[in-house]
């Protein structure tokens, strides 16, 4: 299993980032829409993340929309030299807070410029193409050549340093890599949902980061009970155990747990110090059986 202390790093494009980062989605209002309940708390969470050593923040201009990026800029600009801000394009928000695909060339280009403006940047570190085929929940097969080529063109223009993918299949990863190199893949993955095991291993062999989201998503009651029991035996929270398992799963996994609470932020960061024994790992791995 991979080493994972809070000092452990992995490459994300041209940067080495710590494996425990921060996901900014929850800084917006309910349903990731509108302003936060308490803007001061949102600013405090971001500044505390940096003080705890976070140098990888995941965001998007469709969080809010615009709200989360504007909060990041207010809290942290001018940004620390070692901070990697990763954003994503390919979706937009309806007036009812719905999530809608935004895959046309014009929409993709506008999204990059919106991210640049609201983050206060001249160049974006990493932009992921968020794929929303099917019902938008979970990857669905389909060609991404046209939309990914638009992102690759923006990279060639110098607006984006590195590019990646989100919510994709292994076939779509292969299709994209024929067009341009990617530095990361973001998909749902956790102890109970391990459909990307082969993809993670393949990406590790290529030096490409894998960034899982929803570390506690989709657990059955039995799986949740098992995880809670393990956590109690370790004097840890279920989230800490879930994050520690991911860190030990593979060295190319980068985490972006999100929260709007300073207390939960500190708990999440402490997961980097939680070492799971072989016996504990066997119990957790059995949850996927």
Residue ranges and their predicted role:
Residues 27-40, 95-106, 135-140:
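Active-site mouth loops of central-metabolism enzymes
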